[in-house]
Amino acid sequence: NVADPLLYMVALGFGIGAFVPEVGGMKYIAFLGTGMVCQSAMFTSSFEAMYSAFSRMHMQRTWEAIVNAPIALDDVVVAEWVWAASKAVISTAAILLVLMALGYGRTPLALWVLPVGFLVGLTFGAFGLVMNALAPGYDFFTYFFTLVLTPMLLLSGVFFPVEQMPAALQAAAGLLPLKHAIDLARPLMRGQLPTSIPLHVAVLL
């Protein structure tokens, strides 16, 4: 879950970055890297809440063993949710460290990207657990990745500014949680406070 975004960041950041030096007042690799931080949190928490939680629930029967103790099923679900968000923070921290090692995001405000990663993890961990509850098998999760996560990855401003898209797509992007996460993270990486923080947090929650 960490290797893929790092590969994208290095390959596209240095490759396209040679032709597009700056985007939105940032080096392209820093612009892309911030998007990769948020999309990594999205994919990590989604994968954990779907594939890993499904395995623990159905294949390993871990949930069944836990609820035999004096623990409610609600507690197990909340624990899975928080664990998915925690893994999102781990992936966020890993990519953030790489960016800082490359000389980007060396500002105290960049540390606030970690709570943003946790919020992203809570959002997509919840989506993942809903899909988990509906899934008859692993193949079912492909629909969520193909129909929800991939379009969100492409339309939320990970690779290029949302402002470059047609007005209708810009309006649609404004409804996407990943776009609001990126709108929080990018200013922080530049050492600036984001605007419309309550709106972005409200969409994520």
PLM-predicted stretches and their roles:
Residues 1-29:
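Hydrophobic alpha-helical transmembrane segments
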Residues 3, 15-16, 20, 53, ...:
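Hydrophobic alpha-helical interface/terminus motif in multipass membrane transporters
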Residues 51-58, 64-68, 132-136, 146, ...:
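Short amphipathic alpha-helical coupling elements at transmembrane boundaries
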